[in-house]
């Protein structure tokens, strides 16, 4: 089987939970060929992989969104059928366009993204939306907003499509559109595996964003919901990591019959071989993160400063690469300002090896799905302090039918005092830590084994391709 994995802003360029999952998935199916179709922001990243690609990756197709501005204008006076005009109108209004018609329209000879955005048809559509919904908004603001919003998607529609038996996208945004394009052009099935709810995550970002004019925030939110609906509609199977995520997909319009829960899987043999930490007089706390705003490392540093007032022998290890260099520099400066001498920023390391130095782990993310780093900690017998986002509380307390017990503490996000209190409590009692760590180990071994995930995806790939061919 030839499987095209469609990726957006992750593997193989950066590390992290989704990238680790993707790498593990590919390595788990040596009998299949994999094609990577990767969307990135900047063409300067072309070929700069942080992973050594497995031997069964036979092709890599890279698409960089900043290349969208390098295209030639094309025909400004392109003629459109009534059907095409309706699809383009629905697209510009961010409702429910006919994606097949859009794909055919943008791939016709002489059509380019810039050409459409400079056409009379686009001007007419933009004038309509201004009159209907934005009568008091500057026309120039609307033009630049729609241009920046629509250009990347129009650019993606014009890409050459690699051949595959199935197009498997790991997000419901730009990569979802690209997977739909692949399925449409080559008459092949589409699968979606969401690690977080893409449209909800973008909505949260837009609400907080300062770069989006207030008048256009609702339009931007509609835009990302439109992208999600596209792949929800075309995909044969839509997976999520836990029950509440599945409910969210259904609320957003996905057919419940398509929705499957496929939890992450961890190599319990590899991480189970991590020995208990040797007593050395320190209580070592590990934060396995990418240093980026979504991980909220700053709240962790503030909380650790509080911990040091009461637990002098506490030591914090921030384990992972700089995903956002500017934010990382701010974190280093904050650690200096707080006079935190017992904080180590390790950079990228072998997580399994490094966990032998750690008593317990902490994750302070403001948005998560089902963090793989937590499952790795559990498999290594390390309890966790987590923020109450995504599936984190369920991981700590157990889901339906799981009565193993509690594997750590859960606190609300961005609450430094609650986080500090939980860290202090975990530092205080070695016996409680070990008991919670053992519960975590049993939970990982029972419910989150990599072999279970591989079996699930073996069945899903076979089901999707067989059903499509039938």
Kindly give the residue locations of the regions a language model identified.
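Conserved donor-binding/catalytic core segment of Leloir-type glycosyltransferases
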Residues: 277-306, 317
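Carbohydrate-associated surface elements
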Residues: 244, 265
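Short hydrophobic beta-strand element within catalytic cores of glycosyltransferases
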Residues: 383-386, 390-397
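Glycosyltransferase donor-sugar binding loop
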Residues: 315-329
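Aromatic "clamp/platform" in nucleotide-sugar-dependent glycosyltransferases that forms part
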Residues: 366
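Conserved acidic donor-binding segment of nucleotide-sugar-dependent glycosyltransferases
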Residues: 398-416, 425-430
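Nucleotide-activated donor-binding/catalytic signature segment of Leloir-type glycosyltransferases, i.e.
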Residues: 328-348
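A short, well-ordered alpha-helix in the C-terminal region of glycosyltransferases
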Residues: 183, 407, 418, 425, ...
